[in-house]
């Protein structure tokens, strides 16, 4: 009986395992051949997608292995789990256990995107277990290659030097105004400072659409913390499959908010280590800090508004990860900060983050009340070191424009700028026409 069991295990291990992506790349004839090898009786007359599903199911029955893809979270105990994007990287029954020996052998880190094969749970086990890795962040699972990866914290941070093109529609004035008043570069650490109902979420959506349209090389993550579920659905429908939307809604506990945000930024860091450009649009940094305050053990050192001094450590580590990297790659974080909510804590949170960013967009309640969108306060908004992002002739004209607009009331200034922008299809045309 033991010999027979051993033979069965050997036969299982000899079954060639295909991932869903590998099967999608094969022709229908090749899929039919694979199906026959797996013992499928009916392979003709099926659509390609139907045949792929049958092959995956047959593979699972024969080998007891299943193809998995997730983001690694290493726990303090030394082992880890692959968290699934469809579950917003939250712990779930669908997670895959990763042994400490695998983590140590391959030099794996929290945030690594791993593809591979896992076996189903045995008796008295709760989770699938990772058996074989196919790739780590798109790299082959070679311990020598993976252990030579640079560490994000040791890379050289620089000021942003390459500007994001945010103009994608002549009639979309929100992103055109941002391009003029507070240009965003690769590696920017920006705050959108907004009172309630001033249009911060809509502005984030417009920025997301601009990046998707003009910068397909960028990996875009939209992180929604403590937001309403319907806003999550709306954002997913706007960006479709062009960006990753990760959310922890207001009905989740603060621990979940922290865990989701931290695994997202670790995933972004692993991509930047491979010289990729990543953008995180976060709504909101204020609620993330509130969640941090809720999970921080009380120390007795409390600021005005009831927030622990140590509650800022994790949000600052998150926000401070944004940087342009000299060796290649960048991590851009644009986060919203709430003000004028009636909560002293929110004002203290904004004051604490005020000097940490290198770009700020201030939304103004007065413009919002007059239904002027974008409700941007031009005088208060701007980008540090904007001369690195703009052409010299653009910079000179924008300075002249700002000087002229500073003599006006914020409402008049925005109305004037919008009226002028509507006359031209692009910002370049508008700036060149300023001579006349």
UniProtKB/Swiss-Prot annotation:
Gene that this sequence comes from: rho
InterPro entries referenced in this protein's UniProt entry, alphabetically: AAA+_ATPase, ATPase_F1/V1/A1_a/bsu_nucl-bd, CSD, NA-bd_OB-fold, P-loop_NTPase, Rho-like_N, Rho_factor_ATP-bd, Rho_N_sf
Binding-site list for ATP: 185-190, 197-202, 228
Species of the source: Aquifex aeolicus (strain VF5)
EC numbers: 3.6.4.-
Keywords from the named record: ATP-binding, Helicase, Hydrolase, Nucleotide-binding, RNA-binding, Transcription, Transcription regulation, Transcription termination
Pfam families per UniProt: ATP-synt_ab, Rho_N, Rho_RNA_bind
Taxonomic lineage of the native organism: Bacteria, Pseudomonadati, Aquificota, Aquificia, Aquificales
Sequence ranges assigned to domain Rho RNA-BD in this UniProt record: 65-140
Role, per record: Facilitates transcription termination by a mechanism that involves Rho binding to the nascent RNA, activation of Rho's RNA-dependent ATPase activity, and release of the mRNA from the DNA template.
Protein name: Transcription termination factor Rho
Recorded GO MF terms: ATP binding; ATP hydrolysis activity; ATP-dependent activity, acting on RNA; helicase activity; RNA binding
UniProt keyword Magnesium, yes or no: no
Record-stated family: Belongs to the Rho family.
Oligomeric form and interacting partners: Homohexamer. The homohexamer assembles into an open ring structure.
One GO biological process term: DNA-templated transcription termination
HAMAP family referenced in this protein's UniProt entry, alphabetically: Rho (MF_01884)
SUPFAM superfamilies registered for this protein in UniProt: Nucleic acid-binding proteins, P-loop containing nucleoside triphosphate hydrolases, Rho N-terminal domain-like
SMART domains: AAA (SM00382), CSP (SM00357), Rho_N (SM00959)
